[in-house]
Amino acid sequence: MKKIAALFILIALSVSAYSQSDNWFFSFSMGGSLPLGTFVKTDIDNKESGYAKNGFTLLLDATYPVSNHWGLKGMALVNTNPVDRNWLGTKLETRMNAVPISVADADREFLSLKVNSWMWNALLAGPVFTMNFDRVFWDLQVLGGMNVAYLPQQKLQYEKPSNNWYYLDRNTTTTNVSYGLSAGTAFRFPVTDRINLRVGVDYYRSNAKVQYEQVRVTNQGATTLTEKLGSGSANIPIEMISGTIGFVYYLN
């Protein structure tokens, strides 16, 4: 988040070097995000299922008007969505059983699952069209740019103390960089001469490549043997709609 914010500020400062700086306005908004499509699916037979649950979105943007209706906008987006642990765990157990490694009901206490949330940062830019209704502004925008996804670090481990081995299913990648596209709309309501209330809805789409491996690690006294049992990858579409509320500040 800090790197995206720093890059966003750098771009804003670079553009303002040859623009009329007093025309800029900035906004800060936050709210909820609702995953869509296969990103929200929990189908263990679909490689593109994202197991994403409702999450949180934060937006920071800067706009430079070039006419009464058109402007150029840069946006930094931060989003996070928790993962449905129950269905993801079912998927990983099914994959383990196919090795095959099966866990008896009496041994399930030795089976553990760790997973964190989906999270991504995006740096976007594009045109914005504005309509003015007696001091109330309606913005329509289409933005594109870079998306950096921090992948859920899912790990299923079966480790029974009486065995001289343990099984591990884990991600082999932590981040993925791809293209992101956003289409959104927002209303700006006057509060003071320089401050507006902003209420917006945005659709966002990108994708992330997740890679994993399945291994069995055997203790052979002073050494350990790591046996690769399987591996694979999946391109998961990231798709969500967010509703946010925040404030706009005008330099002039």
Stretches found by the model and what they are:
Residues 35-53, 80-121, 147-178, 206-242:
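Extracellular/periplasm-exposed beta-strand and loop segments of Gram-negative cell-envelope proteins
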Residues 4-13:
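Sec-dependent N-terminal signal peptides
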